[in-house]
């Protein structure tokens, strides 16, 4: 089914996810804009090098899914993405403004597989780097297509 068009089928599908003793969804409410953590439509951009550095400080491999990134890149130096703020980049044929760092919340402490809080991400970031930021927000300035293995170009 197509969740955007088949509302009844979507609600029926959701019913199986909800506890029987809780109120059930009865309608779909659409927002006028995307639901993001920013007041603008944003894309989260993270690097595997920064993740490896953070994982080393925590003493355990942190899953990429813990940080819910839209775009992950290889090949950058750890934490170099913060130097891109204020610049414009191209990924594939899409172009973006690098807007700001992503300040993290307690959700990053939860293991995405188990739901248990098993890593003190915020204190680790603060102790080693003096901030609670991991990743950067992008704002699209030109629509286009991005694919796995596309290079990042600075404009």
Please place each PLM-identified region on the residue numbering.
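Metal-cofactor-dependent catalytic cores
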Residues: 1-155
